């Protein structure tokens, strides 16, 4: 049990008992030893909605959490928990400010309800360091009877639009998709007869979001998020054929996320911005949507459907550009050639939706971020290496 009755926190961690909090200490320390950060969801939104905690209790709880974990280097505080921020906002405000009054060194964010961004309620909150949105698990047209819908109909999969809407709030803060569609989960979550999200879907969500201006991305898997064991049904759309979590580690989407990270980190990161003006033709709709991003001397365009693209190479420095195509599924690079600084039309040779999706990369020819004969980008992951989380 995590908390005693009536929020008497003096009894939350009894001496001589291996308590909930002792076990959480163990998990956080084990994660630190393996270079993993913990997104610490302080309380799930349903508990706040049910009024099982008030602002005064939240203040005391926040102090308890902050004092216990302020010296753990691998904590990111998460307010919310799949809930709209206008439902008892006084609880979230009290909890967040209480933690921040003691713990000044950890980042803090808010996890909203599906199809919302935290910026809708917390754009001015001093305690919030970066925004998240939840694009959710619905396919195009899957409104599912909702009367009050915060997005236009038939835009459910367009997660890039949440980045645009979040950037419109001031002050601008980093943002990422905290809950996109998860690999191997039914579209819409609960119906086992629905088709499931595949590797090419989770790739699309990742590249669309990051190229639209996200600072990172969240990958999820139906089995992994539940640490699903053999013999147990999944909580979401079980058809009786779910794999255990350790088998899901071999699934393609899980192993393809690294190619996006490997692409982004060797390039100048903090100068990168979204820039749809690179696309001199049509931006496209739905699966034909092109997403463009650039730095000062490089530009990239993600193309899910391999549609022909009209692109303006003049948007970044250099009278000549070296151009590559990167296969999003396997990270393989193909050097296309050198091009003059002008508008060009590029048509990917492999045109199979979601199977041959990839990234057009153009770099100022005077720069050496990539080599012409390079077949892959070096793995940028720090997982498995000794890492100082106090850095």
Label every model-predicted segment.
Residues 171-175, 182-185, 198, 202-337, ...:
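Aromatic- and carboxylate-lined catalytic core of secreted/periplasmic carbohydrate-active enzymes
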Residues 65-68, 118-122, 164-166, 199, ...:
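Short, flexible, glycine/charge-rich loop motifs used to bind or transfer phosphoryl groups or to couple energy/partner
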Residues 31-34, 40-44, 65-66, 70, ...:
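Mature, folded catalytic cores of secreted/periplasmic enzymes
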Residues 28, 66, 96, 163-167, ...:
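Short amphipathic alpha-helical segments and helix-helix/interface helices
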Residues 22-25, 63, 90-93, 160, ...:
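A structural signal for well-ordered alpha-helical segments within the folded catalytic domains
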Residues 125-231:
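Catalytic-core region of carbohydrate-active enzymes that cleave or remodel glycosidic bonds
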Residues 1-142, 153, 157-158:
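Active-site mouth of glycoside hydrolases
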């Amino acid at each position: 049990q995590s908390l005693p009755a009536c929020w008497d926190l003096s009894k939350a961690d009894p001496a001589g008992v291996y308590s909930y909090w002792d076990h959480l200490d163990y998990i956080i320390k084990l994660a630190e030893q393996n270079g993993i950060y913990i997104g610490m969801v302080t309380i799930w939104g349903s508990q706040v909605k049910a009024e099982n905690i008030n602002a005064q209790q939240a203040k005391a709880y926040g102090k308890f959490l902050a004092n216990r974990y302020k010296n753990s280097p691998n904590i990111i505080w998460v307010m919310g928990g799949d809930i709209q921020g206008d439902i008892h906002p006084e609880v979230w405000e009290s909890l967040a400010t209480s933690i921040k009054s003691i713990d000044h060194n950890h980042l803090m964010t808010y996890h909203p309800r599906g199809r919302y961004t935290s910026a809708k309620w917390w754009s001015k909150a001093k305690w919030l360091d970066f925004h998240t949105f939840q694009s959710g698990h619905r396919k195009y047209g899957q409104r599912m009877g909702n009367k009050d819908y915060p997005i236009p109909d038939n835009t459910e999969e367009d997660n890039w639009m949440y980045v645009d809407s979040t950037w419109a709030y001031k002050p601008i803060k980093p943002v990422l998709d905290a809950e996109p569609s998860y690999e191997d989960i039914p579209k819409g979550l609960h119906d086992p007869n629905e088709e499931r999200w595949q590797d090419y879907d989770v790739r699309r969500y990742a590249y669309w979001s990051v190229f639209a201006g996200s600072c990172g991305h969240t990958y999820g898997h139906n089995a992994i998020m539940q640490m699903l064991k053999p013999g147990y049904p999944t909580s979401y759309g079980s058809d009786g054929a779910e794999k255990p979590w350790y088998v899901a580690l071999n699934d393609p989407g899980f192993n393809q996320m690294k190619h996006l990270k490997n692409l982004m980190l060797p390039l100048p990161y903090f100068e990168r911005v979204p820039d749809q003006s690179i696309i001199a033709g049509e931006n496209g709709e739905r699966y034909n949507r092109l997403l463009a991003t650039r730095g000062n001397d490089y530009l990239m365009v993600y193309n899910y459907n391999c549609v022909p693209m009209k692109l303006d190479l003049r948007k970044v420095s250099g009278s000549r550009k070296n151009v590559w195509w990167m296969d999003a599924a396997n990270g393989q690079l193909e050097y296309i050639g050198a091009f003059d600084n002008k508008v060009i039309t590029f048509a990917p040779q492999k045109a199979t939706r979601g199977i041959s999706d990839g990234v057009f990369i153009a770099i100022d020819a005077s720069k050496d971020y990539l080599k012409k004969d390079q077949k892959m980008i070096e793995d940028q992951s720090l997982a498995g290496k000794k890492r100082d989380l106090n850095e």
